[in-house]
Each structure stands twice: as C-alpha cells, then as structure tokens.
A protein has these predicted regions:
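Selective transmembrane alpha-helices of multi-pass membrane proteins
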Residues: 68-90, 153, 178-207
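Membrane helix-loop-helix hairpins that form the core translocation module of multi-pass transporters
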Residues: 38-92, 97
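Structural signature of hydrophobic alpha-helical transmembrane segments
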Residues: 4-21, 71-80, 147-160
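A small-residue-rich subset of transmembrane alpha-helices
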Residues: 34-63, 139-171
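Small-residue-enriched transmembrane helix starts and helix-helix packing motifs
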Residues: 1-15, 91, 98-119
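Juxtamembrane transmembrane-helix termini in multi-pass membrane transport proteins
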Residues: 4-56
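Juxtamembrane helix-boundary/capping and inter-helix hinge elements in multi-pass membrane proteins
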Residues: 27-38, 105-110, 137-144, 176-179
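Hydrophobic alpha-helical transmembrane segments in multi-pass integral membrane proteins
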Residues: 11, 53-58, 118-119, 123-134, ...
Length: 207
C-alpha cells in the first residue's frame, strides 16, 4: 500500500505542479494587496479540495454508470497525463491545463480569480481529476487505503496553498526561468508514469 501511496503522491504533485501556479498568481494579482492574494489562494484551494473529494468519492460510481472499465480508464487517463507531460517538457499548450489568451485576458479583469483559472484548470484540472480517478478506481470505499489516499490529496493541496501564500518571496528566489526548468524535469517523470498507466491498462485489458 505504501508504494501505491507514494506513487499517487508523486503523480498528483507533478500534475498540480504548485510552482507553475506562482507566476500566474503573481501576474493576476499584480497591484493587489497581500490580503487579496491570500483570500484568493485559500478559496481556490478550498474549491479544489471539494472537487477532488467529489471525484474521489463518486468517481468509481461514475465510471460504472458509464460502463467504463478501470483498465480502459487507465489507458485513457494515461494518454491524458502524457499530453500534460508533453506540455510541461516542451512548454506547448495542449489544452489539458493551459488557458487560451482570451481566457487569460478575461481572468485579468475578474474580481474573483479563485474558481477560474486557479482552481480550474490550474489545481483541480483534467490531469488532477484523471489522476484521482485512476488512484481510487480499484480502492474499496471506506478502506484504510481510501482514507490514506484522501490524506495524500490533503497533503498536496496544503503544500500548494503554502507555496501560494509565499508567492512573492519564492518568485524572487526561483524566478520564472527556475520554475520552467523544474517543470520540464517533472514533465519527464510524469511522461514515464503516464506510460506505465497505459501499459498497465493494456495488460489488464488483454488478461
């Protein structure tokens, strides 16, 4: 179980990629006071937590309702995560987690940026939702592993919030370039993990 928890933690942390949020948060809150940035950060993470728990609890039932097998979702989810990995490594916009220029312009004029673009698609976006569905699909509801995985989601979101609350100092130390380099390195790791999801799904479907 520990191996599965560590794998889930690594994949979810790489997918959420808290450091990549910081330049966006800094840009969208430029000219605003620290209280506004803190309020948006807390609200975005709270909304993201609700979305993550919703899919963790009801995701398996949704797959069953749609007649989608766990193996099929591993293949589809793995491909989605691989697309996200390509976006991270080559800094290309695959649409999995990025926003369009028009959406970015709209976000700049929003009074509340917590739901869009912070909570979705940056924190609880398609990649994070797919990762959660993959992790919880084969775990019995109410089991020790089920609650342990909820704890992993909590840890990732707390780390994300902690970084968002210190956006200014972190950006001064790491910078946009440092954040981009780290994102590319994590993208390579995510690509390998995504490929493993697809391999496991194909192997399970053929068994």
């Amino acid at each position: 179980m520990l191996d599965e928890l560590v794998k889930f933690f690594v994949v979810l942390l790489v997918v959420v990629e808290p450091l990549s949020l910081l330049p966006i948060l800094a840009g969208l809150t430029e000219g605003s006071n620290d209280a506004f940035r803190r309020r948006m950060s807390f609200k975005a993470v709270t909304i993201s937590a609700a979305v993550c728990v919703l899919f963790a609890v009801g995701g398996t039932a949704l797959l069953r309702l749609l007649g989608i097998s766990v193996d099929a979702f591993k293949i589809g989810g793995g491909i989605l995560l691989f697309m996200l990995a390509i976006e991270m490594v080559f800094a290309r916009e695959s649409g999995v987690r990025s926003i369009t220029p028009g959406e970015g312009e709209e976000a700049h004029h929003r009074v509340d940026i917590s739901v869009f673009p912070l909570a979705f698609p940056m924190i609880a976006g398609p990649g994070a939702i797919a990762t959660i569905l993959l992790a919880f699909a084969a775990v019995p509801f109410g089991s020790v592993q089920f609650f342990a995985q909820l704890g992993v989601i909590g840890v990732v979101l707390v780390l994300t919030l902690a970084l968002m609350l210190v956006t200014g100092p972190v950006m001064r130390v790491v910078g946009v370039t440092g954040s981009a380099v780290l994102g590319r390195l994590l993208g390579v790791l995510l690509a390998a993990l995504a490929a493993q999801f697809v391999i496991d799904g194909v192997r399970g479907a053929m068994a």
